[in-house]
Amino acid sequence: MEIRVFHQEDFEEVITLWERCDLLRPWNDPEMDIERKMNHDVSLFLVAEVNGEVVGTVMGGYDGHRGSAYYLGVHPEFRGRGIANALLNRLEKKLIARGCPKIQINVPEDNDMVLGMYERLGYEHADVLSLGKRLIEDEEY
């Protein structure tokens, strides 16, 4: 397995992977999310590749105060092999190299399988409520 920065050639393969991982939501346009990330620090957008196939992704960010991780997904046929752990580990190292003191990940409360994985990796439940506001409307995907 190789973990590397996203390349433009990965575009369609990544969107297909996100569909298989059930990461897409009607209110997010994945094509726009990728375009925006490519225009703003693509070095924190990582893919895991096995035999030339993209089998995992994580999209990271850093605002100078905290890091974040989005679009963490692993192809169903490749789960249980440590790919998600490796992607997060690489992202964390990149954030630490930038002086990032902490990372935040938003997870649906009912996603017990993923919550357990994050807890095993040292993530803790933060007693905060995540609020959001759409600033630019995307087309429904």
Curated annotation (Swiss-Prot):
Organism superkingdom: Bacteria
Every N-acetyltransferase domain range: 1-141
Record SUPFAM superfamilies: Acyl-CoA N-acyltransferases (Nat)
CDD domains in alphabetical order: NAT_SF (cd04301)
InterPro entries in UniProt: Acetyltransferase_YpeA (IPR023072), Acyl_CoA_acyltransferase (IPR016181), Bact_Acetyltransf (IPR050832), GNAT_dom (IPR000182)
EC numbers, comma separated: 2.3.1.-
Gene Ontology molecular function: acyltransferase activity, transferring groups other than amino-acyl groups
PROSITE patterns xref list: GNAT (PS51186)
Gene3D superfamilies recorded: 3.40.630.30
UniProt keyword list: Acyltransferase, Transferase
Alphabetized NCBIfam families for the sequence: PRK03624.1
Family: Belongs to the acetyltransferase family. YpeA subfamily.
Protein name: Acetyltransferase YpeA
Phylogenetic lineage: Bacteria, Pseudomonadati, Pseudomonadota, Gammaproteobacteria, Enterobacterales
